[in-house]
Amino acid sequence: MEQVIPKVPERPRRRITRSEEPEQLRSESEFEREKSGSKDSELDLPPVPKTRPNRKPLASSSAHASSDDVSVKPEPQIQAQLQPEAVIETEPTVEHPIVDELEAKLPVEQPVLDEVELDEPVTQEVEPSGELLPEESTIKESLEEQIIDDFADEPVEEECKEVASPELIGDEAIQDEELEKPVKEEPIIQTDDKTLAEAIVPSVCEESEADIAEEPKETPEDASEAVVEAAREESSEVSPEASPEVPPEKTQVSVDQLSSTANLTEGAKEAPKEEQKETSEATSEETPEDSSVNAKPLFKEVTPGNVSSKEAIPSNTSPKEGSPATQKKKQGKSPPVPKKPSSKIAAFQQMFQNQQLQPEHTPSPKEPAAPKTGGFSGNRAQFAQNLNGMIALPGMAQLTPALAKRLGVSTSSDDAETGAEVETKNTKDEAELPKVPARSKKTRGPHKRLPKTVASIEKVETKSTSNISVVKAWTISFKPDLPERADDQPMEAELTAGEAIAPSEPAGLEDVEAEDLNEASPEEPLQIISESGNSDESEIQHTSDPSIAQNVEHEEEVHEEAEAAPEAEPEAEEIALDTEESNPTAFIAETYDEDTEVETPTA
């Protein structure tokens, strides 16, 4: 069989044609054109240069031409922003005259532009693509001359000079630094040239006064820039007639440039504003004299000989030592705080040292007291005083006044008083000692006593209704042995004659009870036989009951029979006694009742 060899799949290859680039990689110019609809619309905007046009430096500052390069945003972008996007015109419109009018109505001083030029990075010089028409240049020249004449006629500079003190007029370095600060731009309003000039100049004065407080914070690099600007102002102020001769392209400022300067100076203005707030708070605390000293003239005629690099660098930016502000700081300083001890042990040692030194430096005033009987005198007294504080004695440690007040204890000044007064004061002090509040204990009643609510209850005593009485039911008496009787007379007669049987007491409650017992057991009469220790004879006591008498007779007969029997058989006699018939006490356990009859021995 033929083996089937599997085919190996071919390796995938990459595409030769690549996909379209994403929107992020497209150039910004193409993206903006698509967004604004320049392809579809009939508006033809001029080409945008890659770099911004640079202003050519003035003739007076040709030496510093390298640092005067300014990059300005192109005009077409702002022109597109000013025109609404929704409106699409069929015919192209010329917008140059509108821009020129705005430029003419918003004059900007030279220092502002110079500062912007220094802050912006240097770019390559590229000539602008658009050229100005001859009619526009003539209009710009006429507007510039009119604005310069308006500034020359205004007396605002004189008012600012009057505010400044004559002492600081000669300080040229500070004036040059003032001119370096930017000027706030006023909003664009379509009004006459004179009204615009009047509105701008007061704002320049206010901003220059606020910038004076920031002068000490400038670095020497800023001072070198101030020298360059001072030289530029020199040429502009000394020869105002020469300014119109300068070509309008160099001196004129467009709306584009103003927008770029506004964007660039926003970051630079935020930091000075914060510093102005701090400095304004510090200057508000000073006296009116200080405010007059800080006020400085805004404008000053500068000649080429007066400007020098040494004058531009401020020598002493710190305030003078003799000024009242520094005097207030010196007076307002609090005294140095004493160092606290590092631990409680160090604090205690320091307190103990102060207590030992206290009686030596501040002796307490001694009152006239009565002479003590057992006191020292002469050299001994002086010796005793020298020992003060060297040997520790009870009560010698002096308390601090705060602790003494809290405890209510007398201080060391009381030691000089007499013995009697000291004793009385000690008793008062003990009474004045604050009583420490005792801990609240649980409320307990009196020890081993019931509370009143329980003790007031009456106790109930139970009385038994049964009465117990003790009665003599019968008695037993012992007599000597009787002689043997020869004749067989009945024992009953002898007993009655000799009164051997004691009669019972008269019938009463006891007899009634005994009768009840006899009735309950008539067959078993109550009978007790007691034997004497000297003889075998026994005396029988019985009651008057006839049943007992019969039993006695029966026992007598038995006794006689025993006597008649021979004495040689005593054992048989004992056996006869053990029987139930011969045992006279066999019935007692059954009939005896402890409740009714109690045995009472006679005396």
From Swiss-Prot:
- From which domain of life does this come? Eukaryota
Please note every region of biased composition (Basic and acidic residues).
Answer: 17-42, 180-196, 267-280, 422-433
Biased composition (Low complexity) is annotated at 349-358
Question: Which intervals carry biased composition (Polar residues)?
Answer: 251-264, 305-326, 529-550
Would you name any one GO CC term? Answer: actin cortical patch
Q: Where does the UniProt annotation locate this protein? A: Cytoplasm, Cytoskeleton, Actin patch
Task: Give me the stretches of Acidic residues compositional bias.
Answer: 169-179, 508-522, 558-581, 591-603
Which keywords are on file for this protein? Cytoplasm, Cytoskeleton
Composition bias, kind Basic residues: at what positions?
438-451
Positions of the UniProt region annotated as Disordered: 1-91, 163-381, 407-457, 478-603
Q: Which Pfam family is one of this chain's hits?
A: Aim21
What does this chain do? Involved in mitochondrial migration along actin filaments.
Q: Name the family the entry cites.
A: Belongs to the AIM21 family.
Name the chain's protein: Altered inheritance of mitochondria protein 21
Origin species, per record, is Kluyveromyces lactis (strain ATCC 8585 / CBS 2359 / DSM 70799 / NBRC 1267 / NRRL Y-1140 / WM37)
Q: Gene encoding this chain?
A: AIM21
